[in-house]
């Protein structure tokens, strides 16, 4: 039996994993099936953390000033520090975008945020994805204080891999045992 012939229904796969009576001795099982099951379990566990962090981030971007001042969540308190990082990094660009938004409030604004790349000693270039995502979160938070509809800017400017690195950073910092 190959992994392509296996039933991909999530609940059935998890039932198979947790119901030890239907699992044969692992020594005789096809290693690709075992790998497929292990990958599925790891993705499921990882997805639950990732979706929780994204939910916290989305909630943070929609919070008003009173809610932010009264929060006890350490993750949200950290997110609040990203605004100053964005101001330091983007400077006048923040003011220019806010001016455009005030000037034409009903228009959809395309906001492209730049990344500074650093040259390594091996003559290659790199961008620290965690720091970039922090600055974008701060930028979006500033925009949302004016009008809370600009969360799309985060997802338009940040690649999946960069967001994944940021989620890993938050998981490591706050969810490690």
Swiss-Prot record:
One of its Pfam families is Poxv_Bcl-2-like
Q: Which residues cross the membrane?
A: none
What does the similarity note say? Answer: Belongs to the poxviridae OPG036 family.
Q: What is this protein called?
A: Protein OPG036
Q: Which organism is it from?
A: Monkeypox virus
InterPro entries tied to this protein: Poxvirus_Bcl-2-like
One GO BP on record is: symbiont-mediated suppression of host cytoplasmic pattern recognition receptor signaling pathway via inhibition of IRF3 activity
Q: Please state where this protein is localized.
A: Host nucleus
């Amino acid at each position: 039996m190959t992994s392509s012939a296996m039933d991909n229904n999530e609940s059935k796969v998890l039932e198979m994993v947790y119901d030890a009576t239907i699992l044969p001795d692992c020594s005789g099982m096809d290693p690709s099936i075992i790998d497929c099951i292990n990958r599925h379990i790891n993705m499921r566990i990882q997805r639950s953390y990732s979706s929780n962090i994204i939910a916290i981030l989305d909630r943070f971007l929609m919070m008003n000033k009173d809610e932010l001042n009264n929060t006890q969540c350490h993750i949200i308190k950290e997110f609040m520090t990203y605004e100053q990082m964005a101001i330091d990094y983007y400077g006048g660009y923040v003011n220019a975008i806010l001016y455009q938004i005030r000037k034409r409030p009903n228009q959809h604004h395309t906001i492209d945020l730049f990344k500074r790349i650093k040259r390594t000693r091996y003559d290659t270039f790199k961008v620290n994805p965690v720091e970039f995502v922090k600055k974008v979160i701060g930028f979006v938070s500033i925009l949302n204080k004016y009008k809370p509809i600009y969360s799309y800017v985060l997802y338009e400017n940040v690649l999946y891999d960069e967001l994944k690195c940021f989620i890993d950073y938050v998981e490591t910092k706050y969810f490690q045992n």
